[in-house]
Amino acid sequence: MREHLTKSSRGCERRYCSSSSQNVRGAAQTDVVMTTSGLTSTTAELPVVGPFDLRDIAMMGFGHRDERSFDGVMRMAFCLDGDYERHVGVAAQQVGDRLELKVKSLGDPLSDTEVEALRKQVARVVSLDHDGEAFHQLCLSDPVLARIHMKAPGFRPALFYSPYEAALWSIISARRARSQGITLRGRMSELYGASFELSGTATLCVPTPSALLEIESVSGLPADRILRLHAVAQAAQRGVLDADRLGAMAPEEAQAELQQLPGIGPFYSSLIVIRACGHADAPTVGEPRSQAAIQQAYGIDHELSDAELLALAETWRPWRTWVSVMMRALAA
């Protein structure tokens, strides 16, 4: 196994990680692999309840993800929940009624607490933190939902890796084409973040909050966006962007708090809370593509008001978020 470290012009380390040798076992970890280069590997599993298809989730095309093919592995590289100061890479593969995770991390082996945090984070990202069978039954009870759901019964919402990364995406991608946002995220991650080789493919991870604060410029990003990224990093360091904390708050309360961050308005605060914290039943309004898909699916010949949309969504409880995402992704 090799770990290649190069210095950017700002003096930040860029980490590129590839494969391995020597096995070590830990109490809550299996197949841990360590080398003197400082890269550690381990494995973990997540149970699958209800219909679930990792391909549908990996290919959703959400945020920075823009996969054009699926080889059976969903590759994820992110800042670990908590203080977001540790990079990890995960290659996830569905095997029957479980998700197998091959994990790579830099530095010391992940502690038992960190392994559990990682499992919880991945479960949230691929929506395995909820009872998929209950969602399946709700969809079958509504002829309109059933027709759409059965196009891809294993589909579930793909989420941002964390509120921290959703906030970064909000700043980077605002008022520009999604493809441009993907390019800028990749550029920043390559220079100041980390890159893990996951099942033969290099996968980039955004900078940690401390590294983000060291950035003075990124080609293509205006100076005011850099200042906004610094504000996101500082918020993460204060615990404002903790996923559990935000997820425990009422969505509207969390959104109001996030709007105190420069560059985060109503739309992006909703994106962070609903699409990064794991809410399954937060009502979604003010999202034109979802609303258009809902109107088409139900044969509604006029533009729904927010009140009408909320009234219709009452029948989807406790899965209003999942239904809205499913409508947008599959209705066409």
Per-range role (PLM):
Residues 9, 17, 21-25, 29-332:
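HhH-family (HhH-GPD) DNA N-glycosylase catalytic core used in base-excision repair
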